[in-house]
């Protein structure tokens, strides 16, 4: 039985375009191949071709996400489920309708590029998507980012589970009640629609779809959605997941030539194992080079889309030039990584790694967590916002982001935390906290840990050999730290011993521990006492200083 056509779907919103209109009339261009989308983008002056074959575009004024312009429509079906607040801002149905009407009128006056894809490699938990874009370059972006359905799946597709209308050139009326600017990213769960207006940053489309899945998977499927990358051992088929906010190393650390890449950013964890929500990767590329990150460097070729990357006079990308933004990005299909596991599915994880970028430089490069400590760090999600990932962020800023992805989680954090706790409760999954940020001092004093060292630490955690090390217990942060690791200088593993001044380290560690405690008391005081007890303890610093002893105790 033939499926519903994109024109029929879009007509429900008032978009009257068709694929074969009369001469010189705007039209729908549906499911174009990547090469044709590149041609359209260049012809329409949306971007330029780089010497490596990638399409290079500029996103305009907004070079990162705009959290203050992200909204969820407050409808009866979600009113009592959404964790409303600064992250999930409510918008009235009336304001939503006004924005949608403007976008529909705007799109009816120009060609619209339609891409059909899927969110979720596991067909038991897939959501079908129809994305209508003003720009060919954004259609190419989402084509490469979504899980790609088979031709026969498209042929029999009925109504999509969600639609996206992306009109970066449309400026909303800031006078519409609830809006903060001329840009708006709006999710309507009742109508199953996402509106993206006034911003050319393609990550808004990607993260809006992720936010939708972060609601639908737990509520409808009992699946834990995760802001993480995932990889697989090619021999044992054991999997690992890497949690972390943008810029903490998820993409870089999961693109490992010795392992199979399942995905770099968004996954689900079901009773059967894990699966990639996407079909592509969206990597930061500031400072990208072939030596340190060859897999990502070589993935930037024809079919990839670079955002805000500067080209030299020979059209060669200059990844060190951040004159447009720190948040230079490249999107490419996962198949561009040679060792990609294109099935996008794997077994229950053997290892979970929480990646944090510590701007204070006091957390160890790697530490082992108990089950309760894993719950603690999952709900608190300490990291630093990296320059460029959000508008206005120009230097690392310490922050607590629940679940290492709070900006994309519509439900109460405890919904997700409880699901993770249930999945690691049997003890088969080892959990580590990995600091990819500063060591030897805070931002401006110390330096960011070398990628090669982090890779070695992660490799030893994945193969289990790090457990052969002697561990010391950090009394302030309440974690166990290995004292040796192959490929890593012993001196950097215990931060207090690496700082030039132990007194300054103690003070900085105490201050961060206080931040942990205050954040926990403010948001999570209702959690079990065992979880609270597994977190940092600022009082330990004062007690130790009073007794004149160190802050580390030996533990095997």
Residue positions per predicted region:
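Generic C-terminus detector
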Residues: 492, 497-556
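Gly-rich Lys/Arg/Thr-decorated short loops/hinges at beta-loop-alpha junctions or inter-strand turns
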Residues: 78-84, 188-193, 397-403
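Conserved lysine of the Walker
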Residues: 250
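A short glycine-rich, hydrophobically flanked beta-strand micro-motif that places a catalytic Asp/Glu
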Residues: 115, 223-230
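Glycine-rich, often acidic-flanked micro-motifs
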Residues: 2-49, 227-245, 255-258, 268-498, ...
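Charged, amphipathic alpha-helical linker segments immediately N-terminal to NTP-binding catalytic cores
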Residues: 160-162, 166-218
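N-terminal accessory targeting/assembly segments
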Residues: 1-156, 547, 551-552
């Amino acid at each position: 039985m033939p499926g519903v056509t994109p024109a029929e779907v879009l007509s429900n919103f008032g978009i009257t375009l068709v694929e074969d209109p009369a001469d010189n009339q705007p039209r729908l261009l549906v499911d174009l191949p990547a090469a044709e989308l590149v041609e359209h983008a260049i012809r329409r002056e949306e971007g330029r071709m780089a010497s490596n074959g990638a399409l290079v575009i500029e996103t305009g004024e907004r070079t990162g996400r705009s959290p203050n312009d992200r909204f969820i429509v407050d409808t009866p079906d979600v009113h009592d489920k959404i964790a409303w607040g600064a992250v999930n801002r409510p918008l009235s149905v009336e304001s939503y309708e006004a924005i949608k009407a403007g976008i529909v009128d705007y799109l009816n006056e120009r060609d619209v590029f339609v891409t059909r894809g899927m969110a979720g490699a596991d067909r038991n938990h897939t959501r079908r998507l129809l994305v209508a874009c003003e720009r060919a370059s954004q259609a190419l972006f989402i084509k490469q980012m979504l899980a790609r359905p088979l031709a026969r799946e498209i042929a029999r597709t009925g109504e999509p589970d969600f639609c996206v209308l992306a009109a970066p050139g449309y400026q909303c009326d800031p006078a519409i009640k609830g809006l903060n600017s001329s840009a708006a990213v709006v999710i309507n769960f009742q109508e199953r629609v996402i509106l993206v207006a006034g911003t050319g940053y393609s990550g808004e489309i990607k993260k809006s779809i992720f936010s939708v899945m972060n609601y639908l998977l737990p509520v409808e499927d009992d699946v834990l959605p995760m802001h993480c990358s995932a990889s697989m051992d090619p021999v044992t088929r054991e999997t690992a997941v890497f949690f972390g906010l943008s810029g903490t190393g998820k993409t870089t650390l999961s693109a490992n030539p010795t392992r199979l890449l399942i995905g770099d950013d968004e996954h689900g964890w079901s009773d059967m194992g894990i699966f990639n929500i996407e079909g592509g990767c969206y990597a930061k590329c500031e400072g990208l080079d072939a030596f340190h990150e060859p897999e990502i460097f070589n993935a930037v070729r024809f079919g990839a889309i670079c955002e805000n990357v500067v080209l030299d006079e020979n059209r060669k990308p200059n990844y060190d030039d951040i004159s447009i933004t720190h948040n230079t990005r490249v999107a490419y299909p996962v198949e561009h990584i040679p060792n990609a596991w294109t099935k996008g599915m794997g077994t229950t994880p053997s290892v979970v790694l929480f990646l944090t970028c510590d701007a204070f430089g006091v957390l160890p490069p790697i530490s082992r967590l108990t089950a309760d400590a894993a719950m603690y760090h999952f709900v608190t999600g300490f990291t630093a916002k990296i320059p460029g990932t959000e508008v206005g962020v120009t230097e690392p800023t310490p922050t607590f982001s629940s679940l290492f992805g709070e900006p994309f989680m519509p439900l109460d954090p405890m919904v997700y935390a409880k699901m993770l706790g249930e999945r690691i409760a049997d003890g088969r999954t080892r959990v580590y906290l990995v600091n990819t940020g500063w060591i030897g001092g805070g931002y401006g004093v110390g330096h960011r840990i070398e990628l090669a060292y982090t890779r070695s630490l992660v490799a030893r955690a994945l193969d289990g050999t790090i457990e052969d090390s002697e561990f010391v217990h950090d009394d302030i942060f309440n974690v166990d730290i290995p004292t040796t690791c192959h490929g890593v200088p012993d001196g950097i593993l215990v931060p207090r011993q690496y700082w030039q001044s132990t007194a300054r380290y103690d003070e900085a560690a105490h201050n961060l521990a206080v931040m942990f405690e205050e954040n926990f008391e403010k948001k999570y005081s209702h959690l079990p006492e065992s979880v609270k007890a597994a977190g940092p303890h600022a009082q330990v610093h004062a007690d130790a200083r009073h007794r004149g002893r160190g802050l580390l105790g030996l533990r095997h």
